Amino acid sequence: MGGGQTIDVPVEQLEAFPPDQAMRFLQLAHAEARDGFHYMFDSVRISDLVEQRQPLAVELAAAYGFLNSPAFLDFVRALTGDPRPNYVDAQATRYERGHYLTQHDDSAAEKGRLYAFVLNLTPHWRTDWGGLLNFIDADGHVAEAYAPAWNAINLFRVPQPHAVSCVAPFAGAPRLSITGWVRQIDLNLLPGRGPAPNPFRKTP
């Protein structure tokens, strides 16, 4: 979850909360979300784990490798007409019922963000389950909205106001995706220096 600061709470810890503590936790989160930027969803920070040479599921390592492959980066450059992209960071996300991401624009010039992406991995989704990727216009209206579609990627320039609507309490499945930013960075500043680190490298 996040607002003024990002707080990572292990899923096991959340599930172990007694009912009264869980209620207070949700009330605090919802108070933050009511008037500002806040989010609540499950995530695995793929890029951080790769760069720190931490253990990572083979499937997630493969996804990171694909996103940073010449084939994918060339695809992004061709699609956008932008020659700058040279690195993609990523996290795996799971939105359960009640999870959300309030309006923000992904502005972070110091991180070299050029485009945001959502690689949707939910096999079946109904629009009325929520979890829509909403783009917000200058009047605060939803100008466009996209439901998760299996194996589809949403790619858009940042900064740009957007949000993920709250997943409905009757949603029939979690909303699964890999998300992140296409960036232009000095690859020599990555841990270990040189090109994007090999996610399959074994930790000593």
Language model regions located:
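Fe(II)/2-oxoglutarate oxygenase catalytic core
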Residues: 1-154, 159-204
